[in-house]
Swiss-Prot record:
The chain crosses the membrane at residues 15-35, 58-78, 104-124, 142-162, 173-193, 208-228, 252-272, 290-310, 342-362, 368-388, 399-419, 424-444. Disulfide bonds: none annotated. HAMAP family: Kup (MF_01522). This is Probable potassium transport system protein Kup 1. It comes from Sinorhizobium medicae (strain WSM419) (Ensifer medicae). Transport of potassium into the cell. Likely operates as a K(+):H(+) symporter.
Length: 630
């Protein structure tokens, strides 16, 4: 009997371990919302005093926002809409692009808009969450008020400084620390529910709807703050591949949702009894002796939440690079065992300067909270639209049935988006500017590479025609030299520019010549047996193809070993890799505005060398340059 139950016990332990890990990574962001969400929701209605019904209505809005948007949309539905186990906007986009018929451009812009909004979120979340936690020091002693921003800056600078070292050593503590945070939140909320048991009326959605109807315009403004309760919900979907659906769902229903609900109920009951606590209900719920430990624990929780968002930005950027939305960047692995732990120095630096700018410009979590909701609501609307396409294309639902399921969610999210748009003049323009910048960058790169490909195709020589001409015996034939040459190309049907330049300038042709194309699949990973393929074109020329998933490291040197196992004979350390380096020159007839030409060329010049990106042996790489008018 014990032998039969052993696998079940092992599976249970694994589920619990994964669920604990997801508490630290997936739910870190949404778990810090109680620090400021209820406080910010109270501000628009607190000028003339807040009635008991208004407080109950606010808490009801928060609980039902968590129920409808997070529980129903993300936890129960979207976690099933995966791309071979991976979630997130770009993963969903990659899946849909495979079967899109005639409206790929719309899907592309929706996808990059969602990705760009997430980058804005990745800048605002660390600044807002760390500031909101450190501000608790003002309640410990007012003498520390002037030190809130400097302390937050030091914490954030340290967080970005350690990214290059990796988080493998400390990440095992993220889950337990965040679990303690949720337990403490739930406990302190539960203790204060007894302050006014009428807060249980918040479970009745009537009070949420009545609040909106009675408050009118102010109610719409309040919705922008209420939405802060669900910020971080996108992380559930984006981190699907790291933990899996069941652990994320299990953690939500057993720990996170109950703790958040208890805390918001407790804050509501506490303010019902103590109206003067509206200035900071979360920290004021703690007794004086527990305030400093609560601030320290909150700071630790916000650091973990910030780390999760930064890691998410790294992962999303890698996906965008592999899908051809961004130029190649340096990607370093910070763990030998966890392939998902990566470090992108360019992205880290960009996020650091962005976060620092937000901290110094806004100076407080109250000011920064007004800028927060737009990026998150925008990303959620994008995800809902992509989910509609997923239901139609992948699950083969009729359009009317898919619309019937998602339209209520879409309408609700549009209401939240409209409420957040009212805050544009108070700082809401910041995430819009950040997102617009990255949309332009990704659109320019995608558009520029397409134009460049079209232009080079017109002047390229078909590969098979070239092989026939070069292998004819004539006095102009290049000198045959021993050894192997691998020529990288993005178009296997055309002759690589590096091969043409090698013959033109060096007048030599190697005994073995491999034309290598590197493909990125629309799936997260490519099975080992489908990684490589080869086709012999002639005695001296072979066409090779290496395929990677958009979540994989594109280590070409490692993949070439699979060719040798399949029978192709060559020694990688005696093989020369020939790469073409293009010097791009703008052209008035490029098809893009002049400013976009310049931006595309700047992006191309900033891209990391292919030899570094594809992990080629640097002492075996030969680069041959050419001018290309774009």
């Amino acid at each position: 009997m014990s032998q039969l139950s052993a696998p079940g016990a092992e599976n249970t332990r694994r589920l619990l371990a994964m669920a604990l890990g997801s508490v630290g990574v997936v739910y870190g962001d949404i778990g810090t919302s109680p620090l400021y969400a209820f406080r910010e929701a109270l501000r628009p209605v607190s000028h003339d005093g807040v009635t008991d019904v208004e407080i109950v209505g606010l808490i009801s809005l928060m609980i039902w926002a968590l129920t409808i948007i997070v529980t129903i949309k993300y936890v129960l539905f979207l976690l099933r809409a995966d791309n071979q186990g991976e979630g997130g906007t770009l993963s969903l986009l990659a899946l849909l692009m495979k079967t899109a018929n005639g409206h790929t451009a719309i899907l592309f812009f929706m996808g990059i808009a969602g990705a760009a909004l997430f980058i804005g979120d990745a800048m605002i979340t660390p600044a807002l969450s760390v500031l909101s936690a450190v501000e608790g020091l003002k309640l410990v002693t007012p003498a520390l008020s002037d030190y809130v921003v400097p302390i937050a800056v030091v914490i954030l600078l340290f967080l970005f400084a350690v990214q290059s070292k990796g988080t493998a050593a400390v990440s095992k503590f993220f889950g337990p620390i965040t679990l303690v945070w949720f337990l403490v939140m739930g406990a302190v909320g539960f203790m204060h529910i007894a302050d006014d048991l009428s807060i249980f009326r918040a479970f009745n959605p009537y009070y949420a709807v009545a609040f909106l109807f009675n408050e009118g315009y102010v109610g719409i403004v309040v919705l922008g703050a209420v939405f802060l309760t669900v910020t971080g919900a996108e992380a559930l979907y984006a981190d699907l591949g790291h933990f899996g659906r069941r652990p994320i769902q299990w953690a939500w229903f057993t720990v996170v949702f109950p703790a958040l609900t208890l805390n918001y109920l407790g804050q509501g009951a506490f303010v019902l009894k103590n109206p003067e606590a509206m200035s900071d209900p979360f920290f004021l719920m703690f007794p004086k002796w527990a305030l400093l430990p609560a601030v320290i624990l909150a700071t630790a929780a916000t650091i973990i939440a910030s780390q999760a968002v930064i890691t998410g930005a790294f992962s999303l950027t890698r996906q965008a690079i592999h899908l051809g939305f961004l130029p190649r960047m340096a990607i370093f692995h910070t763990s030998e065992t966890h392939t998902g732990q990566i470090y992108l120095p360019n992205v880290n630096t960009l996020l650091m300067f962005g976060v620092m700018a937000l901290v110094f410009i806004f100076g407080s979590s109250e000011s920064l909270a007004t800028a927060y909701g737009i990026s998150v609501t925008g990303a959620m609307v994008v995800t809902t639209v992509l989910a509609f396409e997923f239901l139609r294309m992948r699950w083969n639902w009729p359009a009317w049935w898919a619309a019937g399921v998602l339209l209520p969610l879409f309408a609700l999210e549009l209401v939240f988006l409209g409420a957040n748009m009212l805050k544009i003049h108070d700082g809401g323009y910041v995430p819009i500017l950040i997102a617009a910048t990255f949309i332009v960058i990704m659109w320019t790169w995608k558009r520029g590479t397409a134009i460049l490909h079209t232009k080079t195709r017109h002047i390229d020589i078909p590969l098979e025609r070239f092989i026939k001409s070069i292998e004819r015996q004539s006095e102009h034939a290049p000198v045959s030299v021993p050894g192997t040459a691998i020529f990288l190309t993005s178009d296997p049907e055309s002759t690589p520019a590096a091969l043409l330049h090698n013959i033109k300038h060096n007048h030599v042709l190697h005994q073995q010549n491999f034309i290598l194309t590197i493909r990125t699949a629309n799936t997260p990973k490519v099975p080992r047996e489908e990684r490589v393929s080869a086709r012999r074109l002639s005695e001296r020329f072979t066409l090779m193809e290496v395929r990677f998933g958009f979540m994989e490291t594109q280590n070409v040197s490692q993949a070439l070993g699979l060719f040798r196992k399949s029978g192709l004979k060559f020694d990688i350390m005696s093989t020369s890799f020939y790469l073409g380096r293009r010097k791009l020159v703008p052209d008035a007839q490029s098809g893009m505005p002049h400013w976009q030409d310049r931006l595309f060329i700047a992006l191309a010049n900033a891209a990391i060398d292919p030899s570094d990106y594809f992990r080629l042996p640097t002492n075996r790489v030969v680069e041959l340059g050419s001018h290309v008018i774009i």
